[in-house]
Amino acid sequence: MGQKIHPLGFRLGVTQNHHSTWFAPLNNYSELLKEDERIRNCIQQYVRKYVRSSSRSAEIARVQIQKKTDLVEVQIHTASPSLLVQTRVPNRSTNTQEIGIEYLRRNIQNTLNPGNRKLNMTLSQVAKPYGEAIILAEYIALQLESRVAFRKTMKQAIKLANKSGNARGIKIQIAGRLNGAEIARVEWAREGRVPLHTLRAQIDYCHYPAQTIYGVLGIKVWVFQNKSLISNNQQM
């Protein structure tokens, strides 16, 4: 019986790096780990409530956190930084609207553990968004939630990945009650090469749920990216 391992965790230290970088004594490690989770949850809640809609995804590729003694650095990699900056959030206390990024910064600052630590939050633009697995998975989820046929959605996602120029191969898998069928099944599509057993291959992976009227669909996306340590002519 085959055993499966997470493609990103399998490549840590080879082609993947941790998204959180900090050191802590053993008695304080759990508190800093919970703080990381609160920061990421704060960003996700802000995106779901104010940015993401039925026709627009947040397009956040990843969130990197670095901690020092008196400084917490949060870097948000997104396809459209202007979308996060231009979002307006209603302020109930003053009955006005404030800039969304300032609202997010204040909420993250409030989630930090007590101490005189400053927060430095930056937005970084992703040059080729549709070469990122998470952004492709969000796109597929939006299409499925809008009742677009799953085969058409997979073909369109593969086209977007190929147009980005950052994908040497892509595999998409969707599981659940597809097109409202009574019996759940798994369908997948692949184009190019996706060498999951090769550690030097730069594989990006994401699992994302889609909330449809027929239930939850599970979406998995694997992208074999161009920035791999393997040359195009090397055989595997």
UniProtKB/Swiss-Prot annotation:
| CDD domains noted in UniProt | KH-II_30S_S3
| Coiled coil (residue ranges) | none
Q: How does it assemble?
A: Part of the 30S ribosomal subunit.
Question: NCBIfam families per the record?
Answer: rpsC_bact
Q: Which PANTHER family does the entry link to? A: 30S/40S RIBOSOMAL PROTEIN S3, SMALL RIBOSOMAL SUBUNIT PROTEIN US3C
Q: Which family does it belong to?
A: Belongs to the universal ribosomal protein uS3 family.
In Swiss-Prot or TrEMBL terms, this protein is called Small ribosomal subunit protein uS3c
Recorded source organism is Zygnema circumcarinatum
